[in-house]
Design a protein with these regions (language model features):
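Short Gly/Pro-enriched turn/cap motifs at secondary-structure boundaries
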Residues: 62-63, 89, 104-107, 131-134, ...
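Short beta-strand-to-turn element immediately C-terminal to the catalytic PLP-Schiff-base lysine
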Residues: 75-77, 117, 143-147, 162-164, ...
């Protein structure tokens, strides 16, 4: 039984499940075998995540977030950094996170004000990050920092720095009261004169924004699978209900209006799955496409919200109570149109690139 089913309104974090997932090879699927991963692709990663999200969105999100940002090491890390940080993540022995969002820097990433000043052989970091996955449970964070504030190019002012969470000055406050995904850890982070060696710079100084965009071009492809999995799970629940529930002397699944709803839901899910798989396949072929990835993320999030709404409607009044799994899926769906790039940001990307330079 999924943990959130047993305790639907309790924030849970089960480290033993992460370790078990690591033992089974479900973590770090896209991490090279040389660094403890399975050496597979983003498509395989997406398929695994879809199946987790189909059953338990909260636990699925926690398992996905364990390696959230690992792409940065593969793309821009030194050999020493890869050897040090990636194997424990792939094995489920270490948890990472990516601290990007700030109180005044959400979709406007370049407004991030958390500063990292090079002081001798160390970076001194100060600032706050909000709504960070694994912020109070992670062993290390990738922190998006302002390192070159005087550069006239906004896109060259930031860097990504590795920060171990046991360093003095790192504090985290676990957030409670989330609408959904309560089995995953989310926290606000406070960095007060946190010192890390300059070797903790990931990639090049001033190249943080470009590196972040490269990450989003990958993560959004498999995050699209979150929406596909949640939608499929909601459809599964709806079908189980309409096959057993009777009204007017008939199974409600026998009514044409019900069948039409199911047909629309199933079609949307298959379309979302197809474009999500296309986005991941292109990445695995070295042909990643920013527009396709944005389309996949935007459409799968919309599909999740629309499908789970219809699925709950088919449950009638029963679906409104928390002893029904569909209620948990309903609460989890909305974030898929918000995190990892709000749907409006994805539309901006798609529209701008489709129209071309004016």
């Amino acid at each position: 039984t999924p943990y959130p089913t047993l305790f639907p309104y309790t924030t849970l974090f089960r480290s033993e499940l992460i370790k078990k997932a690591g033992e089974l090879g479900f973590l770090g699927v896209f991490i090279d075998e040389a660094y403890g991963g399975a050496g597979l692709g983003f498509l395989e990663h997406a398929i695994i995540l879809e199946e987790f999200w189909r059953v338990d969105p909260g636990l699925a999100q926690q398992l996905c977030s364990v390696s959230f940002g690992a792409e940065e090491f593969l793309l821009f890390g030194t050999e020493e950094q890869k050897q040090k940080f990636l194997p424990p993540v792939a094995e489920g022995k270490s948890i990472m996170g990516f601290a990007i969002t700030e109180p005044d820097a959400g979709s406007d990433t370049l407004s991030a004000a958390t500063s990292a000043v090079l002081d001798g052989d160390e970076y001194r970091i100060n600032g706050n990050k909000v709504m960070i996955g694994n912020g109070s449970e992670g062993d290390f964070m990738l922190v998006f920092c302002l390192t070159n504030p005087e550069d006239i190019r906004r896109s060259r002012r930031h860097s990504i720095i590795i920060v171990e969470t046991d360093r003095p000055g790192y504090e985290a406050d676990t957030l409670h009261g989330k609408m959904g995904l309560r089995a995953s850890n989310t926290a606000n982070i406070f960095l007060s004169d946190v010192r890390v060696p300059k070797e903790n710079l990931l990639g090049k100084q001033g190249n943080g924004f470009a590196q972040l965009m490269a990450f989003f071009d990958r993560s959004r492809a498999y995050v699209a699978a979150h929406g596909v999995g949640l939608s499929q799970g909601a459809l599964d629940l709806a079908i189980a209900h309409i096959r057993s529930r009777e009204q007017f002397g008939r199974k409600i699944g026998s009514f044409q209006s019900t069948q039409f709803k199911i047909a629309e839901m199933a079609t949307k899910i298959e379309l979302a799955r197809t474009i999500a798989h296309k986005a991941c396949t292109l990445l695995d072929q070295g042909k990643g496409n920013t527009d396709i990835t944005a389309m996949a993320k935007m459409y799968s999030g919309r599909t999740a919200v629309e499908v789970v709404d219809e699925a709950l409607q088919l449950h009638g009044g029963y679906g409104y109570f928390n002893d029904q799994d569909i209620e948990r899926f309903y609460r989890a769906a909305k974030v898929l149109e918000i995190y990892e790039g709000a749907k409006e940001v994805e539309k901006m990307i798609i529209g701008r690139n489709t129209i071309g330079k004016l």
